[in-house]
Amino acid sequence: MVTVEKIMSPHVLSVDMDVTLKEVREIFEHVRFHHILVLDNERLVGVISDRDLLKAVSPYAGTQSERPRDAATLRKRVHQIMTRKPISIGVDSNVLEAIRSFIDDKVSCLPVLNEDGSVAGILTWRDILMAIAATVEKAHVNEQKL
C-alpha cells in the first residue's frame, strides 16, 4: 500500500499563533495554498484555511465601505479563528487511512507528522485525487500494452 509520505506535499506554509489575519490574508493572496499550519515552538497547534479567513474577515475590510469594526477583523490573531488540535496523520500511514480520515472527520487537509511530532508535510484531497489519477492512468497504459 502507498504511504502518505509518497503523495503528500513536503512544502508547507506555517505561521505563529499571534500573526494577524491581515498578514494571513496577504499570504493567501500570494500563494496557491489553501491551508496554513499554525506552529508554536515548531509544534503543530492549529490549521487555518482560506475559508476560515473568509468567514472571519469582514467583506468590507480594505474597501471604500470599510468601517472601524470591519478593519478590526483584520487585527484578530490566528489563534482566535484557527482549528485547534487538528486531525493529523503519520508519514508511514497508508493512503486508505488518509481517505477514511478525510471522509469520517470531514477535513480538507491532514498535516503529516514525523514520529517525533514534527511537521513533515501536508496532505489534501487534491493530493489523493492526483495519486488515484496516476494509478488509473498507469493501469490504463498497462492494459493497452496487453
Which sequence ranges carry the predicted segments?
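Tandem CBS (Bateman) regulatory domains
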Residues: 1-11, 49-87, 94, 99-103, ...
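The conserved cystathionine-beta-synthase
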Residues: 15-32, 38-39, 88-106, 113, ...
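A glycine-centered beta-loop-beta connector
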Residues: 28-31, 36-52, 102, 110-126
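Short, surface-exposed, polar/charged, turn-prone segments marking secondary-structure boundaries
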Residues: 35, 42-43, 64-67, 74-76, ...
